[in-house]
């Protein structure tokens, strides 16, 4: 990384540390000068969270009651702050400082990783779905842009078998494969590319493009992603599979998977998930008939949701949450979420997570699941395993080449120390691989 790149990191780190200092001073001042009002405001926020959770996990009148109480308590809290104009201004400064701290921290740890040079392929092929991502392939004229770069475009038409198309292209001499579409389609291309040891490029023309983000591809530069096959760089990443089916991101079981299975999910995603919540997490919920073994070898039969991912996700953090720092740790990420248990307090951590090269989930019948966002039903037991360094990924030289959270430390203390080092001129570097089960 060049010295020129280090200056923006240093400025961002200084801004993050300054914002954190302002945030701490003002927060302490409000609590001390407004005692006991500050504690009352905090209690109101806790009550609002509890009421909101109660409403989400119920149906009918109980849901309306919980939601109504939460809204009322928040309104009272805002009214209390407005009644004191001076402290309202302080509260607004706190919110602004918090936002600046998060944005500056994200910028301070954003890195560009130089990857290994690789020769351009002679016959690269791009598969694209015109409907994916609201029509991004058509909007950005990807077929024409591909031809201009010597890449053969093949449109995925309605009802076509994508895997059959890909294998046909390989048989006809394709020596590199790219996909412009959603993550489910990316997994199909990646599977064939890994089997044939061919270079693969992920073109972010889907709806969310989670795989592209964690690979270090600029999701806003859809056309530029085609340069992966023109002066691009290469890295190897892991894939994962469940019962022989390859996935690039994750497999979800439980709440999200139940919602994805429902007829109205694609038209009203949030509403469908909210309607599913009481059935999975509520007091009258049917729960999940799942059996799995934890990292200590103990058998379990509970959990509101299970997420098995191709490498570990960063969860529960203000910055970088929902991304994977690496996709080459050679380990599955396993997260089991549970409904809150009475007597353990409101702020109990609602999930447990660990990493392992393999994982198994069993049940008495088949299991509804979401594989890279696509609804499926799987026969049990579900056997997951990581496929280490299975995929040769090509990435445009101008793109970051690393996940947004690749250099992000774990924990507030480690983050503060790292920001201090960056502010003194040190450049952020990717975190080390795990390389062990924990």
Regions found by a protein language model. Give the residues of each.
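Short glycine/serine/threonine-rich phosphate/pyrophosphate-binding segments
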Residues: 184-188, 210-211
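Catalytic core of tubulin tyrosine ligase-like
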Residues: 389
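Gly/Ser/Thr-rich active-site loops/lids in small-molecule metabolic enzymes
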Residues: 265-273, 314-340
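Glycine-rich phosphate/pyrophosphate-binding beta-alpha loops
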Residues: 252, 256, 307-323, 375
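Catalytic phosphate-donor-binding core of small-molecule kinases
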Residues: 47-54, 68-71, 232-235, 277-288, ...
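Catalytic core of DAGKc-family lipid kinases
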Residues: 118-119, 125-133, 137-149, 156-157, ...
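ATP/NTP phosphate-donor binding region
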Residues: 1-177, 187, 400, 409-410, ...
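Short, solvent-exposed S/T- and G/P-enriched segments that are highly enriched in secreted/extracellular
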Residues: 378-383
